[in-house]
């Protein structure tokens, strides 16, 4: 079984749920304290053993490429002003992983975005991390899913339980307990008008 070393981060959405904040700034670049959301996601993937990352973008999101690239003028100024610690952080961004980008020319949904990664992933197993879904923890969520894949050899999805009231906003999986926090699920999705389960995708 091949090791999961690649990750796909769909980040081509319009960010309509967080307007007006995302009108001029991609939602993936909105800061959480001192880092943009997407940096947390890339760092999570790297901590889980991912070495190659494809970020799927669209027009108006080149700021993400700039964020993970070198910035010689800024780096020079930081060194000249004695800010070595900040300099190291800025330089490290360009070396977190092998990050490439592809543009989704039409915003046609998540499935289409992931299909744009076909040439990148080839026949290898890969992780999908949402560009605006930050999960913080000592043990990276992506790493937990990779371990589950390594144990089962099957596709793995991370889910969370939500309240009965919130379930209307999600699609749901029918799950059966397996062990610990692991569940098996059927391939059929429960229609959104049938809120009988509280484990959304």
Question: PLM features: what roles do these ranges have?
Answer:
Residues 28, 98-100, 184:
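Conserved beta-strand segments of alpha/beta enzyme cores
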């Amino acid at each position: 079984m091949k090791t999961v070393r690649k990750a796909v981060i769909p980040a081509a959405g319009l960010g309509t749920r967080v307007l007006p904040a995302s009108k001029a700034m991609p939602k993936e670049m909105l800061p959480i304290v001192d880092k943009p959301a997407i940096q947390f996601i890339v760092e999570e993937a790297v901590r889980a053993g991912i070495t190659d990352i494809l970020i799927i973008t669209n027009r108006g999101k080149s700021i993400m490429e700039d964020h993970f690239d070198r910035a010689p003028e800024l780096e020079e100024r930081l060194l000249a002003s004695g800010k070595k610690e900040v300099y190291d952080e800025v330089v490290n961004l360009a070396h977190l992983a092998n990050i490439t980008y592809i543009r989704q020319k039409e915003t046609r949904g998540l499935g289409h975005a992931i299909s744009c990664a076909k040439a990148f992933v080839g026949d290898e197993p890969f992780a999908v991390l949402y560009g605006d879904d930050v999960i913080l923890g000592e043990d990276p969520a992506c790493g937990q899913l990779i371990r589950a894949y390594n144990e089962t050899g099957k596709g793995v999805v991370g889910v969370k339980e939500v309240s009965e009231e919130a379930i209307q906003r999600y699609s749901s999986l029918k799950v059966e307990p397996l062990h610990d926090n692991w569940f098996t699920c059927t391939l059929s999705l429960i229609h959104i008008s049938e809120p009988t389960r509280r484990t959304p995708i």
